């Protein structure tokens, strides 16, 4: 079995974690990685000993690499090309008739929402991505809800396989920081964290609305992540008068320690699949407040595991923050963190993700799918 995973290469956050952690489970020689940018994905893959091929472009619109990629796939006799992300999907759709390998993709988020709030460019990219999806041999989808989006494109149920995300869990939680020394945050300040790209789909403006509404005075939200909205969000924080409640940390490599330093995790997205960041928070025994933007219910089964609030509802988010604060004061919040950790470790493991993925590969190669 020879599998080539393909990604633009600039992926960060949950998408990158999914790709790298999954590839790392396979025996050496079974999987390789192709990227179009020699960025963070390639770097982390190399560090794990994964073979990486970089097909550099002059720009994302440079299609001259397609001939080289298709010849590479055929010459190396890959059985399957597994794409992640719209750019990889679009490029393989243009090569589909020239390659002998089967084509698989993972749908991490709603393809109708991937380029939301990006104007004409976003509309064009959405159309191209949706058209590309119609030529794929097999889909891994990370939630049942995403199957409905694909069904709207005419994708048959037989081509879709739901495999939930998973991670490796730590027996002990990470050592949290002395927040006074690191961030000048006093011990009596309720500390929340949001690990997300500064991108329109992640809904930071909803969080800022909640922080403006909340009665809580001693609260600080650590904002981990970079993206195109960085300066806009800093201006919005100033406009709403919440600069004292947020800390922009940018891209960080110490996310485990940051989770361990926080009391509750936040995710305020407009659209999600099954977010890995919720599992990463659970791994550090931190419960989450999350918008109903994806299929969250398998993880946050009821109110003893965390909070699911309506999307685009700053008032509901503010109320959830206040409830979490009250539970922090009584010690209930820490108990919720242990509860969701125990649930996650039993149901959303990296080993299960790997085994289900590999078995599906075998069936596809054997033409049973």
Indicate where each model-derived feature is located:
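A conserved mid-protein helix/loop that constitutes part of the nucleotide-sugar donor-binding site
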Residues: 13-21, 190-213, 228-235, 276, ...
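Short hydrophobic beta-strand element within catalytic cores of glycosyltransferases
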Residues: 34, 287-290, 300
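Nucleotide-sugar donor phosphate/pyrophosphate-binding loop at the beta->alpha transition
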Residues: 63-67, 102, 112-132
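Short His-centered aromatic/hydrophobic patch
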Residues: 83-89, 107
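A short, active-site helix/loop in glycosyltransferases that binds the activated sugar's phosphate group
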Residues: 134-159, 167-171
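A short helix/loop element that forms part of the nucleotide-sugar donor recognition site in Leloir-type
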Residues: 172-185, 330, 337
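Aromatic "clamp/platform" in nucleotide-sugar-dependent glycosyltransferases that forms part
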Residues: 251, 270
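Conserved acidic donor-binding segment of nucleotide-sugar-dependent glycosyltransferases
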Residues: 302-303, 307-315, 324-329
């Amino acid at each position: 079995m020879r599998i080539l995973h393909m990604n633009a290469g600039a992926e960060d956050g949950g998408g990158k974690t999914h790709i790298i952690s999954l590839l790392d489970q396979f025996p050496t020689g079974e999987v390789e990685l192709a990227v179009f940018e020699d960025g963070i994905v390639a770097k982390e893959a190399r560090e794990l000993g994964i073979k990486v091929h970089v097909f550099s472009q002059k720009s994302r619109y440079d299609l001259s690499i397609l001939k080289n990629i298709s010849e590479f796939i055929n010459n190396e006799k890959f059985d399957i090309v597994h794409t992640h992300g719209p750019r990889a999907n679009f490029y393989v759709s243009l090569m589909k008739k020239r390659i002998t390998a089967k084509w698989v993709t993972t749908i991490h988020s709603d393809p109708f929402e991937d380029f939301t709030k990006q104007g004409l460019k976003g509309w064009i990219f959405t159309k191209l991505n949706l058209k590309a999806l119609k030529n794929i041999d097999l889909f891994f989808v990370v939630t049942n809800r995403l199957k409905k989006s694909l069904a709207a494109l005419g994708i048959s149920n037989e081509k879709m396989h739901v495999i939930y995300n998973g991670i490796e869990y730590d027996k002990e939680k990470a050592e949290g920081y002395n927040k006074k020394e690191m961030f000048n945050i006093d011990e009596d300040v309720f500390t929340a964290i949001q690990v997300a790209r500064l991108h329109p789909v992640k809904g930071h403006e909803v969080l800022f609305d909640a922080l403006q509404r909340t009665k809580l005075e001693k609260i600080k939200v650590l904002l981990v992540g970079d993206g195109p909205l960085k300066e806009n969000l800093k201006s919005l924080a100033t406009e709403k008068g919440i600069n004292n409640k947020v800390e922009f940390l940018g891209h960080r490599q110490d996310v485990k320690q940051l989770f361990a330093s926080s009391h509750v995790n936040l995710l305020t997205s407009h659209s999600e699949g099954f977010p890995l960041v919720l599992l990463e928070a659970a791994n550090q025994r931190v419960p989450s407040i999350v918008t109903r933007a994806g299929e969250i219910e398998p993880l946050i089964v009821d109110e003893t595991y965390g909070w699911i609030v309506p999307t685009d509802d700053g008032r509901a988010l503010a109320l959830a923050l206040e409830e979490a604060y009250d539970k922090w004061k009584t010690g209930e919040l820490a108990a919720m963190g242990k509860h969701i950790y125990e649930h996650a470790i039993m149901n959303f493991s990296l080993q299960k993700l790997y085994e289900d993925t590999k078995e599906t590969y075998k069936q596809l190669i054997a033409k049973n799918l």
